[in-house]
From Swiss-Prot:
Bias type Basic and acidic residues, positions: 1-18
UniProt keyword annotation of Transcription regulation present: yes
Species of the source: Candida albicans (strain SC5314 / ATCC MYA-2876) (Yeast)
Protein residues bound to ATP: 73-80
Keyword DNA repair recorded: yes
Catalytic activity: ATP + H2O = ADP + phosphate + H(+)
Lineage: Eukaryota, Fungi, Dikarya, Ascomycota, Saccharomycotina
Single Gene Ontology MF annotation: ATP binding
Major localisation: nucleus
Name by which UniProt lists this protein: RuvB-like helicase 1
Length: 458
């Protein structure tokens, strides 16, 4: 007898990479909007989380459009995590566009144009369309031929007869030969479930009817049930696009298939800068759709991290962009106190690296440094997320290290310590592993001290 053994699926290969904010699942607020001490991957920062909860409510009720929020606080206090939690609370349907201040500087595109591009990435458009469709299982597929009008012995397809069956009956359709080409492209055969759009003639193969599911043992087919209702029905289709998608679609129209147009596309590798005129035209079309009730504007969130990297030109443009009729909610983050604004001639210091006229427009959310107990809880959560086990003494040692140096350094020591404990044949990370990691990897303060002592060389 031939031996057959079942291959067990390797679960470890499915696990996604553990990133810096993998553990963040939301703001962790209760029904009254009050922050729970440890919830949604957050520990502490109750006031900041509650403030962000109010911002989320304002965004959902569409009362926050064109306003800006600044999350300010020392490094490693969860500013980026708060912005990520806001995006998760809003859900996947609301556009969220995260960028870093230095991303706006490019040799090909102007700074202001790059900022406007990201502005429009953060504004969604929900288009609702009612389409007439014929949906059912194919029970007949007969092309009808006719004499070639151009002469000769060949024949052309004049039309195609398609029979469709649904739960409530059958219909036989006489379709144009162009639709027959679409049917051939989709490789439709009898027994497939398809739908045909009445207006455009687009054909979509949904899958194979589940009545044929037992025909073969090994198949890569997707079996679907027989469509409910009548063959001819009206379907409401909702599409979510951003204004930037519409800009790009209109900025790069599809050229012909001739050699000149193909050469033109090859010779133009540079990024296309979308003009203000094109954006204005797109805005007019969008406004028309909104007035007709066909589309709905969904203001999203533009998150700009390290806002102190922006210069005076961008800040001036940002002031104007926030006042425009179509603007998203802008969330800024800065870990600077009083610092010089880039591009200012007088070198005057401003709070958080933002000019005073922009600071007036911002709602400022403050994040505070973590205490030792909070650091201990965060390290414990990260360890469980990475599948590591620490002894109580090792956790205490790491939390003290996080308090004296930085939380990031303490969290970064976890994985190397896990490797050392596995190499030594231990199932738990001990104080010895932490001390060895501290010896092998310097933190910023010890590294600076070494440089000061050696002065001219490492």
């Amino acid at each position: 007898m031939v031996q057959i053994t079942e291959v067990k699926e390797n679960q470890s290969s499915r696990e996604s990479r553990t990133a810096a904010h993998t553990h963040i699942k939301g703001l962790g607020l209760n029904e009254q909007g009050i922050a729970k001490p440890i919830e949604g991957g957050f520990v502490g920062q109750n006031e900041a989380r509650e403030a962000c909860g109010i911002i989320v409510d304002l965004i959902k009720s569409k009362k926050m459009s064109g306003k800006a929020v600044l999350i300010a606080g020392p490094p490693a206090t969860g500013k980026t995590a708060l912005a990520l939690a806001i995006s998760q609370e809003l859900g996947p349907k609301v556009p969220f566009c995260p960028i870093v201040g230095s991303e706006l500087y490019s040799a090909e595109v102007k700074k202001t144009s790059a900022l406007m591009e990201n502005f429009r990435r953060a504004i969604g458009l929900r288009i609702k369309e009612t389409k007439e469709v014929y949906e059912g299982e194919v029970i007949e597929l007969t092309p009808e031929e006719a004499e070639n009008p151009l002469g000769g012995y060949g024949k052309t397809i004049s039309h195609v007869i398609v029979g469709l069956k649904s739960a409530k009956g059958t219909k036989t359709l006489r379709l144009d030969p162009v639709i027959y080409e679409s049917i051939q492209k989709e490789r439709v055969t009898i027994g497939d479930v398809i739908y045909i759009e009445a207006n455009t003639g687009a054909v979509k193969r949904v899958g194979r009817s589940d009545a044929y599911a037992t025909e073969f043992d090994l198949e890569a087919e997707e079996y679907v049930p027989l469509p409910k209702g009548e063959v001819h029905k009206k379907k409401e289709i909702v599409q979510d696009v951003t204004l930037h998608d519409l800009d790009v679609a209109n900025a790069r129209p599809q050229g012909g298939q001739d050699v000149l147009s193909m050469m033109g596309q090859l010779l133009k590798p540079k990024k296309t800068e979308i003009t203000d005129k094109l954006r204005t035209e797109v805005n007019k079309v969008v406004s028309k759709y909104i007035e007709q009730g066909v589309a709905e504007l969904v203001p999203g969130v533009l998150f700009i991290d390290e806002v102190n990297m922006l210069d005076m030109e961008i800040f001036t443009y940002l002031n104007r962009a926030l006042e425009s009729s179509i603007a998203p909610i802008v969330v800024l983050a800065s870990n600077r106190g009083l610092t010089t604004v880039r591009g200012s001639d007088d070198g005057v210091k401003a709070p958080h690296g933002c000019p005073p006229d922009l600071i007036d427009r911002l709602l400022i959310v403050r994040t505070l440094p973590y205490n030792q107990e909070e650091i201990k809880t965060i390290i414990g959560k990260r360890a469980s997320l990475e599948g590591l086990t620490l002894t109580d003494d090792a956790l205490e040692k790491l939390s003290k290290q996080g308090l004296t140096t930085s939380l990031r350094y303490a969290v970064q020591l976890l994985t190397p310590a896990g490797v050392l404990s596995t190499t030594a044949g231990r199932s738990e990370i001990t104080v010895q592993d932490i001390e060895e990691c501290e010896f092998l990897f310097l933190d910023s303060r010890r590294s600076t001290k070494v440089l000061q002592e050696t002065k001219t060389f490492l």
